[in-house]
């Protein structure tokens, strides 16, 4: 009788800890916003940042926007969100 109760207690403890960790990691979502009026997007300026894995997704997002002739508006790695601007590159 002792063994099943200890096992269930540990199971509840582990499941509550994992839910707390999942909630904390989702709070740390970062959205990178780019404004073409203040500084136009330059892919060479991100070369230093590409060593961080999360920026790589936004770099690909920016290249996709540039292929369409648009500026990048927002990029979020966690949500896999990539939005291009409405206005064309001049």
Curated annotation (Swiss-Prot):
Which body tissues produce this protein? Expressed in the pistil. Detected exclusively in the synergid cells.
Q: Which compartments does it reside in?
A: Secreted
Q: What does the entry list under GO cellular component?
A: extracellular region
> Glycosylation annotated at which residues?
23
Protein's GO biological process: pollen tube guidance
Stretches the record annotates as PRK6 binding: 67-87
Q: Which positions make up the signal peptide?
A: 1-19
Q: Which UniProt keywords apply?
A: Disulfide bond, Glycoprotein, Secreted, Signal
Chief localisation class: secreted
Lineage: superkingdom: Eukaryota
From the record, give the cysteines joined by S-S bonds: 58-75, 61-82, 65-84
Tell me, what does this protein do in biology? Answer: Pollen tube attractants guiding pollen tubes to the ovular micropyle.
How this chain assembles, per its entry, is: Binds to PRK6 LRRs.
Q: Spell out the family assignment given in the record's similarity comment.
A: Belongs to the DEFL family.
List the protein's name: Protein LURE 1.4
The organism is Arabidopsis thaliana (Mouse-ear cress)
Q: Gene that codes for this?
A: LURE1.4
